[in-house]
């Protein structure tokens, strides 16, 4: 009798303690949940690519420290997304091993981005030359990643009405813009053309094709990003 009563009490306590998490998750739409899980892995993709390219080119020039510096920032972005997943009781899709992804598209994309081939078949309109073809190609890979992140983050912002989620996304967007500025500076602002921000395949209602590169890069003196 005592054992049965104990089990009942324990079950009630478990349900009571768990209810807030399930309630928070239930408050999100399926698309919001999908955005959160995708964004967590997309930030991991950026982090893992930059770490891999830094290790590959390490010692090749001082400009390559950009990959290590931005990888550190991407880790903060990953942590911020993990915080949102935990807040809403959503399972974390990110594997701890570098270069391993639950999302099959991101897995294939990672392979292209860090390859030494000049003839990759694009997965998401990325450059056909992988980041290990040369330093310039690696910089273009970095810039492409940040452009891709910006598009996906803007889509995710338009897809939620929750202030906490939108706030994290806005910080991520600020960070991606800062990272894009850094890569464009290495490539030469006068020589760089956006790779997908103006692409008709990627432009949505929140992205206007006539907007300039300067618009996307923003003014770094006005921004403090995580």
Question: Which residues make up each language-model segment?
Answer:
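Short hydrophobic transmembrane-like helices used for membrane targeting/insertion
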Residues: 7-8, 21
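Sec/Tat signal peptide C-region and signal peptidase I cleavage site
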Residues: 17-23
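Bacterial N-terminal signal peptides
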Residues: 9-16
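All-alpha RGS (Regulator of G-protein Signaling) helical domain and cognate RGS-like helical scaffolds
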Residues: 25-226
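Bacterial N-terminal signal peptides that target proteins for export
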Residues: 1-7
């Amino acid at each position: 009798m005592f054992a049965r009563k104990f089990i009942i009490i324990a079950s009630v306590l478990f349900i009571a303690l768990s209810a807030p998490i399930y309630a928070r998750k239930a408050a999100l739409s399926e698309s919001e949940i999908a955005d959160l899980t995708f964004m967590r892995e997309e930030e991991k993709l950026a982090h893992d690519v930059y770490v891999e390219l830094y290790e590959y080119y390490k010692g090749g020039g001082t400009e390559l420290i950009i990959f290590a510096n931005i990888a550190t920032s991407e880790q903060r972005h990953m942590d911020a997304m993990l915080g949102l997943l935990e807040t809403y009781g959503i399972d974390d899709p990110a594997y701890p091993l570098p270069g391993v992804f639950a999302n099959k598209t991101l897995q294939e994309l990672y392979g292209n981005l860090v390859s030494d081939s000049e003839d990759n078949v694009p997965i998401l309109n990325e450059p056909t030359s992988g980041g290990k073809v040369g330093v310039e190609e690696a910089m273009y890979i970095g810039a492409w990643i940040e452009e891709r992140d910006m598009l996906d983050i803007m889509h995710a912002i338009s897809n939620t009405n929750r202030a906490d989620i939108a706030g994290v996304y806005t910080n991520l967007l600020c960070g991606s813009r800062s990272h894009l500025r850094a890569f464009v500076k290495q490539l030469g602002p006068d020589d760089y053309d956006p790779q997908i921000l103006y692409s008709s395949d990627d432009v949505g209602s929140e992205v206007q094709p006539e907007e300039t590169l300067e618009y996307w890069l923003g003014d770094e003196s006005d921004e403090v990003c995580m």
